[in-house]
Amino acid sequence: RSCLVGSEMCIRDRLIQDYGDHIELNQISNNYKKINCEGLIISPGLVDSRVQIREPGLEHQETIKSISKSATCGGITSLICMPNTNPVIDQPALINSIQRKAREVALSKIYCTGSITRNLEGKEIAELQLMHESGALGFSDGNKSISDTRVMRRAFRYVKSFNGLIIQHPEDQSLTSEGVMNESEVSTRLGLKGIPYYAEPIIIERDLWLVRETNTRYHINHVSTAAAVKIIRSAKKEGLNITCDTAPPYFSLNEMSVENYRTFAKLSPPLRSENDRLAIIEGLKDGTIDAITSDHTPQDQDAKRLPFDQAEYGAVGLETLLALTLSLVHNKHLNIFQALKCLTTNPAKIFKLESGMIKKNKDADLTVFDLNKSWKIDPNKFYSKSKNTPFDGLLVEGRNIMTFVRGRLVFSS
């Protein structure tokens, strides 16, 4: 089930024991604690498949403890971290270390991806199979694409041997290295160096040839252009073994948000044109885009309050992911089931997690939210240690009320 409305649920020993209209409250043992969710929607806990955890190395921006608190506030029960920590997650020992720390302090479930190449340098393949055996759910070079096609081909072939997942940040680095925003008349007017939109589809097109050759599982992060949506739609019709996601900025904002040199709207990939934004929504509507992720990228104030071309990329997103996705429901672009599928079932399937669904005898990872509750986004109230959001002051509808992980109430508003 993708959600429950007006039904009861029983949780016992951290598992979903039963759910449905047939449950009579007056017949439930007094040993159960009763929680009133009248007027609320119970959904599977959100699965966020692209998160920068920052620990180890940049704990002043985020820690495993702070990120898990931020996640549960946003209704996220499972999050998948990218490998670009310091040191880089390119060996099993680092995965084991993060998982051990997560078991000690995290409220949510935290999973790792490993880097495709050693130290994210794009040259030498890392210990992929050993990381896979240690729990890595996939392999990515984080915020970089691998420029050398021979290296990428070796990675595809290697990962195929154990049915692993390649995750791509699709940007041709030779076209993006000097740019800081989408290349357009807006970048020209602002006097900022632009990144051409086709830097994204060029890498996707290249990688699709490797998918055709190897049939390796391939996932594309934060799709942002109409051209990429068109290519992915065609590739899926061809039957290629691919999936993709996007993030709220790419269906909520466009390049005009960079006006006045707003560094909090400086993202990677950059915010695109209005036509691109509308194409992302169409991709979500027709199922071309499988999942929605927060793309949570914490940055401290000093890293953002610089001239635009010097400021760091990225925005936090754990605590706004649900509400911004529900805006697609309120604006009649998606129905509630489509929206929740992008946040729960689909990412869980892509990363082979036993979550993202309401099912008997499975972990009670649940999000209880009010679809119509209005609130104003205020980063000063975030649990995240970083406050860099382009949505500061935005009035949204839909708010998480309670979060359960393995049947335990870990957040309540």
Question: What is each model feature region?
Answer:
Residues 1-6, 10-11:
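Single conserved hydrophobic/aromatic residue that forms the stacking wall/gate
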Residues 38-104:
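Metal-associated gating/positioning segment near the N- to mid-region
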Residues 123-292:
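Histidine/acidic residue-rich metal-binding segments in metalloenzymes
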Residues 43, 92-109, 157-168, 320, ...:
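Alpha-helix-loop-beta-strand connector modules within alpha/beta enzyme cores
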Residues 307-310, 363-413:
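C-terminal cap of metal-dependent C-N hydrolases
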